[in-house]
Structures are given as C-alpha cells and as structure tokens.
Amino acid sequence: MRALTVLESVSRADGGIFEAERSLQCALVKAGGVEVRVVGLRDEFTEADAGSWGALRPRVAEVFGPKGIGYAQGFAGLLDTDVDLAYAATLWKYPSWAVLNWQKKTGKPLVVAPHGSLDAWALNNSRWKKRLAAWFFKDEQLRRASCFRALCVAEADAIRAYGLRQRIEVVPNGVELPDLSTTEDTENTEGKRRLLFLGRIHPKKGLVGALRAWADIQNSNSKTQNSKQWQFVIAGWDQEGHEGELKGLCGELGLKAFSSARQENLKLKTPSPEAADVLFLGPAFGMEKESLLRSADAFILPSFSEGLPMSVLEAWAYGLPVLMTPECHLPEGFASSAALEIRSGEEGGPGSDFSFQEGLRTLLEMSDRERALMGARGRKLVEEKFTWPKIASQTLALYEDLLGR
C-alpha cells in the first residue's frame, strides 16, 4: 500500500501538529505494510527538523507570498498519483486546494484530519479568513473527503455539527513512553516545585486566567499551603506577541517574573530565577523539552480549544499530575483521576479565575504521594490507549478498510 501524507509544515513551525503527524507517519513505516510519502511547505525550520523524520524524507515546496496563504507553485507537482490514497492534515492554506484538485483528478480515497480546526472556538478565531477559505475551496475539500480522522469523540461531534455526513473514525494522538528509572531535578531553582505549561503561547491557551489565579494563590494573604514553594514555568514559542502581554500582566498582578531572554529582565526587574513566581523559558525542543518534563512536578493546560493535546499526553507519559480544562477533550483523564478539572470561563475572564484557583489550590495542597499517584494513573492511561504502535495499527486498519482489503 502507498499513502500520500499532505501537511502544511514538516517542522516545529506547526507546533503540536508536527509532533503528532511526524510520530504517526514514522510509526506507520515502522509497523510495515505501507509506503508513506510526505509532502509539505518549506519554512525556517524545515532543514533543522529533517533528521527527526528518520527513514522518511519529506518533499517540500517553496512558499511564495504571504505565509498565511501558503501558496507554493511547485506543490501540486509533489502530489503523486501512483499512490492508493491520501491523508491530509491541512484545511486553511494552499495545500488544501492542491489536495482537493488531486482528489478530483485521481478519484482516490482522501482522509482528512482537521486536528481541532472545526471546533466552534477555532472556527470563530480569524473568522473572516476562514469563511473566505471555506467559500473558495475548503468546504468542497471536506465534502469530497472519504473519511475524517477525529482525535476524540468531541471532535467527531464538531465535524457532524459542521454538516458533514461522511465516515468518521476516532483515532487519537499518541506519545512515546520515556524511561522513568532515572530522575532529573537539576533544573529546579532552590528546590522549588514546578508547575509547567509547555506549548504554543497563544490567547486560546488560557494563560491569562491561569496567571490571575496564580497571583491570588501567591498573594501574601493566601491561605493556600505551600504556595511559596512553587513556580509557574511557561515554556513555548510566542505567537501574536502574547508572551509580552503575559509578562506585562505579571507586573500588573504583582507577580515576580523572570525570562530566559536577558534583555527582558531589565523590564521585569526580577534579579534571578530563584526569586521568581513565574519563569518564561522560551521554546523548548528535543533534550531541552525532555529536561523540562523530567524536572516538573505538575502540568497545566488551561486551554479554550484543543483537538487532542500532545502536551497532556506527554505530561502523563512522564508521570505528571495534570490540571486541564474539559476543552482538552481527554475525559478519561478525569474519569481515571489522572487530572484535575478546571474551567476556562470566557476568555480567561472573572468566570474562570475561581475555577483555576480551586484547581491550583487542590493541587498544591496535595501530598507528594497523592500527586505521584495521580501522575502514575496518567502514565497507565497512556500505556493502555495512547502509544504510537497502537495508533499506527488503528490508522493502518482504517486505510485497508477504505481500500476494501
């Protein structure tokens, strides 16, 4: 079997979608039975991340004009017609148009993976641009899809709510299980415990509400036990200048913030990471990312909208207790007591602060053993449902079924 995989980016520029799709395509190759051909758009990280694809060698086309459109003159020529089917994890840019034309030309099965892009919150973000894309090509691409890959039941419901009636297969993301026989706490500052956020720093992640709640928890009048023994660590790549807004908010809230960018600390006026309530560490990949996960004591994702977040699965894989919103679409985490539920309210407004405070207070006042048991339940959940060999097997079975094999 030959499968064509169409992506917008084959590098870290696409954040968690890159991590998820690279891992899935590599797992399919490892499982055997399918030849995978990956195509995407070139960006500033394409060469740096090429080695992470292992035996796969993605082919890329150069983008001309605005990156938000992603037009690449040579892209259509990369879409092979001698494959059995195509899998597309792209909706809003030129590759969607190209794969639509490929499907019209070949008539072969097309699997579309929206990765949360059809959720109500995501559709309302940059609404006019998405309406234009829908009118020009996206809706036709969706109507021509043979099947949709939903990451969770909630995403399947969102696909149906968009008016699509084709087959939907729920195939979640997965993660690698790290060896936890060794621990790493050298990154901790003065023995402080770490609450980690790791991911794209974007308004939809709910960090405004989380910081407001953190400020209340860290307040000198707070009744929360052990609050001064913790730091809030925010690591990830900035989008739309939101990191700067969060740093400004720290100042307004009286939180001592420290940034890995030296010039920023002249503004933040926090002399050292040891003295900080909040650490901004910038993007983290590879070994640096692993080090952060190993040195963390808990994980938080207060998001307004997700497909199925890789970051939570990775946190569980490292045995971390998790604070997350229902919009992370991992209800099994709450059901198995691997996560505490917090509610995002409206864009981090007052309605969310109390929920965040309660969740943070519960986490901080738990004993080390209670947090460790919560993290262990998360790792067990990953072992049972979210490893890449399992996900690759589900995907391969879907491909074979679509081809009538």
What does each of the following model-derived ranges do?
Residues 39-45, 198, 231-247, 282:
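Glycosyltransferase donor-sugar binding loop
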Residues 131-147:
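Membrane-proximal helix-turn-helix segments that form the acceptor-binding/catalytic region
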Residues 304:
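Aromatic "clamp/platform" in nucleotide-sugar-dependent glycosyltransferases that forms part
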Residues 321-324:
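Short hydrophobic beta-strand element within catalytic cores of glycosyltransferases
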Residues 154, 174:
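Carbohydrate-associated surface elements
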Residues 244-284:
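Nucleotide-activated donor-binding/catalytic signature segment of Leloir-type glycosyltransferases, i.e.
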Residues 370-385, 394-396:
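A short, well-ordered alpha-helix in the C-terminal region of glycosyltransferases
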Residues 19, 23, 193, 197-218, ...:
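A conserved mid-protein helix/loop that constitutes part of the nucleotide-sugar donor-binding site
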